[in-house]
Amino acid sequence: MNTTAIRKFRDKLSADQPVYGLWVTLESPSITEMAVALGLDWIVIDAEHGHLDWRDIVGHMRAVVRSDTIALVRIAELNGALIKRSLDTGADGVIVPLLVTNCCVPFW
């Protein structure tokens, strides 16, 4: 988790500044390396619809280390093990699809 990048991201949002990012569905971390080189604010690694395995996700996380780009992982479903594993790879956050309210989210 990159707290400096998260702080910069939140500051931009608080100041109503636009944030730019990329939705990643490909296995190659070269895509993420390009996003970092372009100075994008965020990437989302799509583990719901993409054909990514955990090795691919770790490769993308390595590409954002020590950058100002935050990395989020979108998992396939509300599942504590998937959330924990995503965070263990170094994700700055997790996107859980198909949640209408936070009433369905247990606290782990």
Question: For the regions a protein language model found, what residue spans apply to each?
Answer:
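Expand to "…catalyze enediolate/carbanion chemistry for C-C bond making/breaking, isomerization
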Residues: 1-108
